[in-house]
Amino acid sequence: MLPYNVRNAGGGSVGGILRRTGQGSGTGSTILGNGNSPGALGAGKVSSSLENHRQPPLELLVFGYACKIFRDDEKAREMDHGKQLIPWMGDVNLKIDRYDVRGALCELAPHEAPPGGYGNRLEYLSAEEQRAEQLCEEERYLFLYNNEEELRLRQEEDLKRLQQETSGGCFSQVGFQYDGQSAASTSIGGSSTATSQLSPNSEESELPFVLPYTLMMAPPLDMQLPETMKQHAIIEKTARFIATQGAQMEILIKAKQANNTQFDFLTQGGHLQPYYRHLLAAIKAAKFPPAPQTPLDQQNTDKEAPSADDHSEEVAGGRRNPNQVVITVPTIKYKPSANCAYTQLISKIKGVPLQAVLQEDESSNPGNSQHSGGTASPALSCRSEGHNSQGGEFTPVLLQYNGSTFTHEEESSNREQQDDNDVNGGEPPQVELLKNTSALALAQNYSSESEEEEDQVQPEKEEEKKPEPVLTFPVPKDSLRHIIDKTATYVIKNGRQFEETLRTKSVDRFSFLLPANEYYPYYLYKVTGDVDAASKEEKTRKAAAVAAALMSKKGLSFGGAAAAVSGSNLDKAPVSFSIRARDDQCPLQHTLPQEASDEETSSNAAGVEHVRPGMPDSVQRAIKQVETQLLARTAGQKGNITASPSCSSPQKEQRQAEERVKDKLAQIAREKLNGMISREKQLQLERKRKALAFLNQIKGEGAIVGSAVPVVGPNPPESAAGAATADSGDESGDSVRSIPITYFGPDDDDEVGEQRPEMRLIGSTQKDEEDDDEEDGGDLEKYNLLNDDSTNTFTSKPVLPPTAAPPPAAVLLSDDDDVQLVATTSTRSSSSRHLKTHRRSRSRSKNVRSSDSSPSSRESSRRRRQKSSRLSREPSSNPPRKSQHSSTQRKKTPKKRRRSKSRSRSKSIRRSRSISILRNNRRSRSRSPSCRNAEQRRQQDRRRTPTKKSHKRHKRRRRSSSP
């Protein structure tokens, strides 16, 4: 047994072969089941052939098991003799295999036919019923004998051929009549007359071939020509298509029409291949233009009418030949409502409200007989008989086509009668203007259900055509005229600036845009619609040139003159953009030449008067001088202009425009100068604020400024200049330079009753000065930056030389070996050192005030004052300055003096260490982290051991302090 899933997938198995059933399996099983009936075998063959034809082949699945086969000759011999068969139903003559399905049947008597055979099994029915049953049997088993799909396709093809034959020879699927079935039935009845009248192509296809008169290349004599005009038409159309589309399309058509005998001329062996090649070459050489298509009515009239004049008279009179083919075209009346999408679209396009559009439609189309906007429809169409007043329904109205125009079916007969009466009466026939139909006309011919149709038809109004103007300039050829017309259309839409763009883009192609071109007048005529536009523009151009020449003689610019000459064309002035700086507050110049109002002039004058008080005297004098020169020049021009009365008004406008421009330029110059001055003043004020803040900080710390010490020696030129600048700075108050400090506060360690003057001589070597300068050199950078006036470009007052010579210098000597020089005035660097030293002395004095009673504190204060005075000197490169200093010295005992010296030595050692640490820190900022670590280790080692320089300084002080 097979597995269950395999049996289900296969749909059953026979001998290990599984069969997948298809759609027709049911029918096949029915046939095989009824195999006992006569003719069942043949029916089975027919059904199998139909199944193979209709359905795809069945999918077969072969499935089996592997088994071993053993050779057993004895068993095979028994099988051949049929020893394995058993009798069926006890009949020894009929033996079956044990696997035979007939073994399941026990009794055959109910299933056997009677001894005489079956008679008519429908004998119990009446004759009509038996006839109906036979028809049902035929329909029931029709699929066994006939293919329904092929039969249905054959019927559809026959129906299409019948429709083509009855529709007048055209290939339209829908006829021009709503009652197409009745027309088809009538045409079937009289097919001979219908085909003769409605199928002219059939007659044309049978016409013999005549060489077309438009073919200017005659074919050779030995070339085989087509037999009929139909073959020629196919060849001609194919040749024209291939000539326009290319040779690739010929290959495609040849592949698609390989089985069509009408396209045998495309193959190499076709007998019409040379004629096709000849037509193709003539079309490519432009020697075979297409023939104009003549309407059918003209052909019929040419055949029947003896002369062309009679035919023209018939067409002009509107008469129709009774034998002429009439084609009826249905039209349905429609009138748009207010909420119609078409009406809303028209209102948006025209830019008018909906009510105006509806009124315009009603006024232009009162009887639905004529349409506005140039759209055409049949002239007398859609009378009220096509409209049903009960439910708003409408019926089609037929129009007759006589070859060139559409007319109403009933009115055509009436018009024929009227034409006959007119001819007999003597009135000349009037030509009726008819328009072509379009989709818009059909849309306007529909009538809405909400409104009733008007029955009265007003006669159409003849439009009066304006006479065409006479062109005095040359008209270009058709190709160039088309380009000029298109360019003029774009220029009208986009403006004359588009003309400038085209002129700069391509001069050769658009040469007609140049005024010197011969077709420029035609171009202007297309743009403006005026024939004399070119002459008018030429006159304007000449007037502008004359004005420019006059202005150049007077020494004026032509910008204002051109604007004055073209006063009527102010809209053509060029657009100018003024690019100015952010700080400049000057107004933009006017693009169009116009007079400035009184408010603007008053505001400008007020602004000028407001700006002037803050300006320096020299700048004000320069501005006044420029203004006087401008006024003198304009006055001279005014005299010259008044002397010439011929061109007074344009030159007056030019003069006024130039005056306004000059005033604005002067105002711009004043504002720029004022802006520069204001920026300098801002920088000055900022420096003042910084200096005042620094002074307030010094005053807040409790510094008391004393009177200056009188100078005892001659000042060098630098000191004298510094003093002069300080005095001038105090007088002007515009800027603060530097503040020299020569006094460091009162002596807190003075003892009452022990004051006595003491003269000392203090001497120092050059090494001490360098050390002191190096100590305080880096700490004074910030203050020097604050008091640096190198960026100040304005000096309020010049430096005055000293009036009186200073007294001779005096040197104060004391019991010490050092020499001390004190200067009343110094440069900016010395003053900064004074300030720094003053801060250090104040900090030290606060620490020492706690021990005022000890004599060592008094000695240390004296040492600090000496050190601060030494720091106030200039660097070693500058020459030394001498000054006079008077102070009170106190006598001390030798024991107290030694203590104070030892303390001062220890303090100086600590101070030198701290200064060296700070200096190394500054140097290590610009180094790498590894270098910084190495520098820190060196500084720690230096803190432990004093430097060699400090040892030398201690030795010198020890020797000087020893008695």
Swiss-Prot record:
Pfam short name (any one): Surp
Entry GO terms, CC: nuclear speck
Modified-residue entries (Phosphoserine), positions: 438, 447-448, 450, 649, 912, 914, 916
SUPFAM superfamilies linked: Surp module (SWAP domain)
Biased composition (Pro residues): 799-809
Bias-annotated ranges (Basic residues): 831-847, 861-870, 882-913, 945-963
Record keywords: mRNA processing, mRNA splicing, Nucleus, Phosphoprotein, Repeat, RNA-binding, Transcription, Transcription regulation
Main location: nucleus
SURP motif repeat feature ranges: 234-276, 483-523
Keyword RNA-binding carried by entry: yes
One Gene Ontology biological process: mRNA 5'-splice site recognition
Region (Disordered): 290-322, 360-430, 445-470, 593-613, 634-662, 716-963
UniProt entry tagged with the keyword Nucleus: yes
Record GO terms (molecular function): RNA binding
Composition bias type Low complexity, residue spans: 718-727, 820-830, 848-858
Biased composition (Acidic residues): 768-778
Lineage top rank: taxon: Eukaryota
Start-end of Basic and acidic residues biased regions: 300-317, 407-418, 458-468, 652-662, 934-944
Domain comment quoted from the record: RS domain directs localization of proteins to the speckled subnuclear compartment and the purpose of this localization is to allow colocalization and co-concentration of components of the splicing and splicing regulatory machinery to permit relatively high rates and/or efficiencies of reaction and interaction.
Function: Regulator of pre-mRNA splicing (and, possibly, of other RNA processing events). Regulates its own expression at the level of RNA processing.
Record-given protein name: Protein suppressor of white apricot
Lineage, highest ranks first: Eukaryota, Metazoa, Ecdysozoa, Arthropoda, Hexapoda
